[in-house]
């Protein structure tokens, strides 16, 4: 028997049984290693998200529930509204420091900063790029204030601590003109787009060229930072931020068509790097005759049906805000779905930021109702997201 085994082993090219056994053991070890790696790899991929998502879930637990929102809605004055928020850890430290809208948005900016700091290294860059929304928001507020002739104190009250160049922007609160603001920002990454758009403002007296140029720079930078999707998490980011671009483009086109503007009027403000709507489709939409043409041109996309369902309300009200609300609701649903679809990855972070945005938006609506006596309660409830 032993001789037969030796003969077989020799026929296979092995000099001895010992060498054959050694090869078998080595092969088993390699197979075992492959199995271990295949088993551990998913766990290793999830590990960087464990701490960030634990932090995020703790914050999700502090979001306002329906009962709390109803109680806030039932407050009878601005002071009572503020008193309620003083009892909430997330808002308490801001309520007595800033005017109410600035207080609410300051908490939102802090939330964005927190998420960007704890995001795993593999996806941190897009979250850092997303913080620049506060630079753009503050520059818009600054130039609006200067165009309106507001004082330095009034201007500062419009600025939210956040972004990368807040100190520079705040330092320009006493600027006397939009042109002086543009000059004061020449050392920032926004200098080029502001200088290019300034002539449009000087020719028309409208801030739209500057505001749209800032939006375009922000969105293009965000998409560029996400880059090409390489795994499930970056695919989600690419889809989500790409959808943000789609929605921004659609808002611009719908408003432009409601105002009777042409392709040449619209095209400088469009970002050609969205998720579903390609450049050729954007061109077709910009060349549409009217709002109805834009909606019908979206047939075959996710946006087509939802905007078609809102078309009758637009026809009766004449306000494109109905479309904007539908588009924003769609983005919020997408964020919630990602939180469920990728609960151990980037999903909870996107879902949380979206829900926080909605919370702050709702609080700003309620704050407005407390500030303006006689604001209809039915209108408030209709405006809540």
Swiss-Prot record:
It is a peripheral membrane protein. It comes from the Archaea. It is found in: Cell membrane. One of its GO terms (cellular component) is plasma membrane. GO terms for molecular function: ATP binding; proton-transporting ATP synthase activity, rotational mechanism; proton-transporting ATPase activity, rotational mechanism. Disulfide bonds: none annotated. Its main location: membrane. InterPro entries: ATPase_csu/dsu_sf, ATPase_V0-cplx_csu, ATPase_V0-cplx_csu/dsu, V-ATPase_V0D/AC39_subunit, V-type_ATPase_csu/dsu, V-type_ATPase_csu/dsu_dom_3. One of its GO terms (biological process) is proton motive force-driven plasma membrane ATP synthesis. The keyword GTP-binding does not apply. Pfam families: vATP-synt_AC39 (PF01992). Keywords: ATP synthesis, Cell membrane, Hydrogen ion transport, Ion transport, Membrane, Transport. Has multiple subunits with at least A(3), B(3), C, D, E, F, H, I and proteolipid K(x). Component of the A-type ATP synthase that produces ATP from ADP in the presence of a proton gradient across the membrane. NCBIfam families: AhaC, PRK01198.1-3. Belongs to the V-ATPase V0D/AC39 subunit family. HAMAP family: ATP_synth_C_arch. This is A-type ATP synthase subunit C.
């Amino acid at each position: 028997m032993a001789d037969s085994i030796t003969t077989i082993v020799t026929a296979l090219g092995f000099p001895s049984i010992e060498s054959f056994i050694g090869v078998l053991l080595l092969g088993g070890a390699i197979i075992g290693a492959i199995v271990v790696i295949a088993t551990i790899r998913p766990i290793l991929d999830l590990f960087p998200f464990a701490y960030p998502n634990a932090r995020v879930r703790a914050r999700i637990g502090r979001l306002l529930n329906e009962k709390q929102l109803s109680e806030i809605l039932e407050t009878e004055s601005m002071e009572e509204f503020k008193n309620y928020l003083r009892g909430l850890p997330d808002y308490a430290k801001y309520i007595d420091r800033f005017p109410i809208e600035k207080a609410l948005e300051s908490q939102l900016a802090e939330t964005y900063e927190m998420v960007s700091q704890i995001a795993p290294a593999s996806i941190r860059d897009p979250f850092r790029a997303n913080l620049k929304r506060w630079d753009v928001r503050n520059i818009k507020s600054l130039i609006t204030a200067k165009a309106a002739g507001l004082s330095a104190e009034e201007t500062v009250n419009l600025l939210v601590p956040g972004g990368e160049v807040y100190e520079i922007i705040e330092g320009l609160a006493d600027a006397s003109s939009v042109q002086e603001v543009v000059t004061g920002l020449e050392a920032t990454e926004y200098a080029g787009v502001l200088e290019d758009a300034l002539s449009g403002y000087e020719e028309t007296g409208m801030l739209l060229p500057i505001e749209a140029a800032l939006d375009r720079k922000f969105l293009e930078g965000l998409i560029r930072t996400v880059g090409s999707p390489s795994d499930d998490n970056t695919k989600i980011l690419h889809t989500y931020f790409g959808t943000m671009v789609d929605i921004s483009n659609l808002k611009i086109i719908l408003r432009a068509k409601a105002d009777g503007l042409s392709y040449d009027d619209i095209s400088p403000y469009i970002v050609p790097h969205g998720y579903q709507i390609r450049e050729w489709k954007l061109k077709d939409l910009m060349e549409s005759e009217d709002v109805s043409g834009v909606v019908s041109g979206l047939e075959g996309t996710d946006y087509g049906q939802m905007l078609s369902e809102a078309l009758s309300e637009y026809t009766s009200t004449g306000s494109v805000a109905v479309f904007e609300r539908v588009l924003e609701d769609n983005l919020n649903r997408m964020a919630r779905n990602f939180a469920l679809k990728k609960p151990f990855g980037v999903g909870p972070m996107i879902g949380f930021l979206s829900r926080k945005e909605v919370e702050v938006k709702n609080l700003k609506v309620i704050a407005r109702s407390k500030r303006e006596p006689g604001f209809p309660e039915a209108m408030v409830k209709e405006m809540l997201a």
